């Protein structure tokens, strides 16, 4: 297995890992240490050995403090990039840093050719600290503090989004060389779990005035951006949004503006079947509306597509209560921590038991009686309830509960409420080769 080679965008994963981890700049190590992760060792293993790897980490913790931890499977990231390049070869991914800014994850994406969209000065600083050049960053926040615009000008981030008159004036004043993408509101948000339309995007009647204002301010509008919303959106929403973007291109040409050369189709991609149907819809719409634009650069802002399935969270049972047939468990992470995704991202989490203390011979308790169970987070707020009426085998304090698919809007959006420090959760690195 050590000699196995997987090619991603012409890169050898062994070389990627060396440049990502072993050859990381000091700033990467500093960022990792700041996040409670001082080890950058990558463990190669087979795809079906991820649980064994987690058990080995847990075994090391049995005599010490049993803190939650993540495992990042870099092999999954490689597989996802392969899928992207096959399905959307002409669409360049700009990873949405807000989704999960884990440093080794970002470095891996960068090594495979991904660029980045940032929403704030802090995110730009973080990406730059990893040795990524400012030319690979889009400041994709339509409403920015003036201080952040000044910073973007200083460090050379020269592409941003706008959807209001005031934003044009701020950019004209503080960063006049910055090129603009007009953010438009899709008329169909695709029933996304997290729609973006209520907050961002120019309405149809606002597009011409916003183009005119930018033109009068002598700013360059290089293209159009949109976002259909995040999480399980209807892929057909891309069809209408791309058609609307084409109309903006035509309007700008009618006004005598510089030829637009960038189309940003936003995010909303989820790995699996949704991505397949979304990619088909995107390619169909691009063929219909932009087939005669050979100079056009098409970009997207995937976040959860790359992050969600690459991370697995391990938590410890710190308390238990029995009420008849009901089992109630307390774990050491919850809705104020990594599981904030249940509230704010409308996620559905699944739990897998690892009876590392009570049943080491049968870790997953296969064949055991199942009990209706409630799983609480560690804080004193009753809202901090991760799962209700969830059937799991009988578990004990110091057993573990594993949560797969925990990479999207989890640790990145957690808090330190009640003194439970989400930012201190360690991430261990693995590279699982396909079975």
UniProtKB/Swiss-Prot annotation:
Its cofactor is pyridoxal 5'-phosphate. Transmembrane segments: none annotated. It is an enzyme of class 4 (lyase). Keywords: Decarboxylase, Lyase, Polyamine biosynthesis, Pyridoxal phosphate. InterPro entries: Ala_racemase/Decarboxylase_C, De-COase2_C, De-COase2_CS, De-COase2_N, De-COase2_pyr-phos_BS, Orn/DAP/Arg_de-COase, Orn_de-COase, PLP-binding_barrel. Inhibited by antizyme (AZ) in response to polyamine levels. AZ inhibits the assembly of the functional homodimer by binding to ODC monomers and targeting them for ubiquitin-independent proteolytic destruction by the 26S proteasome. Its EC number is 4.1.1.17. It catalyses: L-ornithine + H(+) = putrescine + CO2. Substrate binds at residues 344-345, 381. The modification N6-(pyridoxal phosphate)lysine is found at residue 98. Induction: By virus infection. Up-regulated during the later stages of ripening. Pathway: Amine and polyamine biosynthesis; putrescine biosynthesis via L-ornithine pathway; putrescine from L-ornithine: step 1/1. GO terms for biological process: putrescine biosynthetic process from arginine, via ornithine. SUPFAM superfamilies: Alanine racemase C-terminal domain-like, PLP-binding barrel. It comes from the Eukaryota. GO terms for molecular function: ornithine decarboxylase activity. It holds the Pfam family Orn_DAP_Arg_deC. The active site is at residue 380. Catalyzes the first and rate-limiting step of polyamine biosynthesis that converts ornithine into putrescine, which is the precursor for the polyamines, spermidine and spermine. Polyamines are essential for cell proliferation and are implicated in cellular processes, ranging from DNA replication to apoptosis. Homodimer. Only the dimer is catalytically active, as the active sites are constructed of residues from both monomers. PANTHER family: ARGININE/DIAMINOPIMELATE/ORNITHINE DECARBOXYLASE, ORNITHINE DECARBOXYLASE 1-RELATED. Belongs to the Orn/Lys/Arg decarboxylase class-II family. This is Ornithine decarboxylase. The gene is ODC.
